[in-house]
Amino acid sequence: MRDVDARIGDDGPVLEDWIAAAKTELGIDLDVDVPGLLDMTREVAHGVARPAAPLTAFLVGYAAASAGGGPEAVAEANRKAAQLALRWAAERSEELSE
């Protein structure tokens, strides 16, 4: 197991290890688009609210599973969530400027 210092500023190996462990624990075999999911959660965290990011990630996973699962379903749900977050932020910005 890596020590705490290894986790600070070096997300790559930690994320890879965590995702592998989580997939094993959850009994799933799926390639994870880490950059895409992190981009989506960034848009949600900054455009909506920080707590909305993990909740939206859950909803993306649920939507993908409901659509039959697989990388394409995840990518589509992820794309929709990211676009919604961008629209949400733009609409809120317009409301505040009025």
Label every model-predicted segment:
Residues 29, 34-67:
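Amphipathic, hydrophobic secondary-structure cores in small proteins
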Residues 2-8, 17, 22-26, 39, ...:
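C-terminal binding/interaction regions
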